[in-house]
Regions:
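Conserved MFS/SLC helix-loop-helix module at the cytosolic interface between two early adjacent transmembrane helices
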Residues: 74-112
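Residue-level signature of mid-helix packing/kink "hotspots" within the transmembrane helices
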Residues: 69-77, 166-167, 279-287, 368-372
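Hydrophobic core of transmembrane alpha-helices in multi-pass small-molecule transporters
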Residues: 34, 102, 112-133, 324-338
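Helix-to-loop junctions at the C-terminal end of transmembrane segments
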Residues: 75-87, 177, 285-298, 382
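Transmembrane alpha-helix termini and helix-breaking/packing motifs in multi-pass membrane transporters
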Residues: 48-53, 166-189, 258, 262, ...
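Structural signature of the two symmetry-related core transmembrane helices
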Residues: 90-105, 300-315, 395
Length: 419
């Protein structure tokens, strides 16, 4: 029984510091990532529908999404700079319990200002997992457990689990329609039940994190955990990633659903199906990204897979029918996320191990702050026009980001690419 539990990553008595302990940590993180991704997968799609059901307008939806990202950014910044003082397990369990409290709050509160406060303090994610206080902690742990040659593949698996499970979770966005039809309850009550389920997933994640061992792979970092050696490059990357994130904030899943809902009268069930296939394509692209990165390098993979996806994004609003818009959306999804594992691997590769938590936080937080402006602007644009101006602007900014990233990082290579 112990052997089976160790294989599955469920054995708490793995030898500290050994290979089995490292595998245990990674498996626990993958399991927890999957639980959170499943919840984020449907909540990111149902959030705008729920807020519209409560009587809020597109601008209100944008404001709440913006405040959610701002809150995530502040929390991630605090955690990133102080993570080296605590065991990661403690911080991850606390974050999971906060996730549970967030779901409970959205399930029982319907007034705008209290919801806004919960959005700022909590973990609700309008980007289906793209911005989260969990990520810097998990990235730092994974980068310590993996060798340089395996690091990109490890982050690809991490991203694969998140994206694949989020895609399956997106299918659950059709559950409120089913609950209304089968149970005869109102749409508001059905949506509130989905937020209760989100809270339950938060508790499940807390139990999974609690199983992490308090050993060298998750213990305190040295006191010099802030940026020193890599400060200049990390801040350059943070600025570039912020430009990309600002564009991404205009087209978060919640805002895309809002545009499709307004433009084509999209149902929640169909939205879930669309984003399931989009997530599925993105999931398998992570594995392909590893192969491409081994051939052409991390930076080239980030740039030359991202460019065509941004062009597809610009073209979506010009499509005359929902079918054509969905086709381009899926084509974009097949390419747009290849930079996720490669970007994370690149940042973790070019900084010293003791600076990784701070680097992960500093490159994540500006992304969160920058993307937070996007929903507010997108909501304002969509409140005056059903044309997809947010998509056009987002695609243009992302193309600019790709070109600037290529110019800035072309000579800074990770260890595995240095001959």
């Amino acid at each position: 029984v112990r052997a089976v539990k160790a294989t599955l990553g469920l054995e708490p008595d793995a030898r500290p510091g050994g290979p089995s302990s490292a595998r245990l940590v990674v498996r626990r993180l993958l399991w927890s990532r999957g639980v959170r991704a499943f919840a984020d997968g449907y909540v990111s799609l149902l959030l705008p529908v729920y807020l519209l059901t409560l009587g809020f307008g597109p601008l209100d939806v944008g404001i709440i999404a913006t405040v959610t990202l701002l809150g995530s950014g502040v929390l991630t910044l605090v955690v990133g700079f102080h993570a080296h003082r605590y065991h990661y397990r403690t911080l991850l369990v606390a974050a999971a319990l906060l996730m549970a409290a967030t779901g409970a709050g959205f399930a029982v509160i319907t007034d705008f200002w209290p919801l806004l406060a919960i959005a700022f303090i909590g973990t609700l994610n309008p980007s289906s997992g793209g911005v989260s206080v969990f990520l810097p902690l998990e990235h730092a742990v994974i980068s310590r457990a993996a060798k340089d040659s395996d690091r990109t593949a490890a982050f690809a698996r991490y991203s694969l689990v998140g994206s694949l499970v989020a895609a399956v979770g997106a299918l659950l966005a059709g559950a409120p329609d089913l609950l209304v039809a089968k149970l005869g309850i109102g749409m508001k009550s059905a949506l509130q039940m989905m937020f209760v389920l989100y809270a339950i997933f938060g508790i499940a994640a807390a139990f999974a994190y609690w199983g992490l061992p308090k050993d060298d792979s998750t213990a305190r970092q040295p006191s010099g955990g802030s940026l020193v050696k890599s400060k200049k490059m990390v801040y350059k990357l943070a600025a570039l990633f912020s430009l990309d994130a600002f564009g991404g904030g205009l087209v978060l899943d919640s805002m895309l659903v809002l545009w499709l809902y307004d433009k084509f009268q999209l149902s929640t069930a169909l939205a879930g199906t669309i984003f399931f296939w989009a997530g599925l394509l993105a999931s398998f692209s992570f594995l392909l990204a590893v192969r491409i990165a081994r051939r052409i390098g991390l930076v080239n993979t980030m740039v030359f897979t991202h460019l065509p996806s941004s062009i597809f994004l610009i073209l979506i609003p010009f499509m005359p029918t929902l079918g054509w818009a969905i086709a381009l959306l899926l084509m974009r999804s097949a390419l747009s996320q290849m930079d996720v594992p490669t970007r994370t691997s690149y940042v973790m590769a070019i900084v010293p191990p003791e600076e990784r938590p701070a680097a992960a936080s500093i490159t994540s937080v500006p992304r969160s702050f920058a993307s937070a402006l996007g929903p507010l602007i997108a909501g304002s644009l969509l409140s005056v026009s059903s044309f997809g101006w947010p998509l056009v602007i987002a695609g243009s900014l992302k193309i600019l980001y790709d070109l600037m990233l290529l110019y800035t990082c072309r000579h800074v290579r990770p260890p595995e690419e240095v001959r």
